[in-house]
């Protein structure tokens, strides 16, 4: 997974499997290519995922803001916003 050399990058977005019953996706892993300066939120939008569903991102077990700019080849775990009642 490497960018194409023209200022782009490719990352993998990993979404919770439970979302597959609500959204028509072929897999819980989505590979997306975007510009080098794309944030996690930008990449979620480029992958046409429902951005309002995800509020937490993790890379290598470390939490990152959706405004974080991931590096080429990184795997980003997306998690829903936790709500209590």
What is each model feature region?
Residues 1-84:
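Ubiquitin-like/PB1-type beta-grasp interaction modules and other compact soluble beta-rich domains
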